[in-house]
């Protein structure tokens, strides 16, 4: 049997905040400066910004509406003892990801009674933060994708 036909096709779950952008022309986000051109959001600006539309990019829209695509929960005694260090790793991971992918951003890092809660505008950043925590500090990582919605819940525990 042909190997390319032997694969099961998985349904695609796309970010609902991106659906409206597939037919748009050149656009600049007035809040963050990201540019939409040729079907992609970038930090490189537009070739011809004179005819560009202005609209919030999907990341700025998620931030304004407080609708995260990812949540990371950090729990355990280690978290309370190393909050600044963990926050630094989270921010550095965001800077690296955001440099190439403008829609992957931190929304908030919040203190909670049993640890930290981090929200992101994209699935990939949440997953990448989880893997960075596990690689740097070991601990127990659990990543749960919502099968119906564009959302990921990441749990990291270290006592």
Labelled PLM ranges:
Residues 1-65:
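N-terminal cysteine/histidine-rich coordination modules
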Residues 2, 6, 21, 28, ...:
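Long C-terminal interaction/binding lobes of large macromolecular proteins
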Residues 43-45, 81, 116, 127, ...:
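A broad, structure-centric signal for solvent-exposed, well-ordered loop/edge residues
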Residues 66-104, 109:
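Surface-exposed, low-hydrophobicity interaction/linker segments
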Residues 71, 115-117:
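Short aromatic/hydrophobic contact patches that present stacked aromatics
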Residues 86, 128-129:
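Hydrophobic side chains in well-ordered alpha-helices
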Residues 119-121:
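Short hydrophobic/aromatic beta-strand micro-patches
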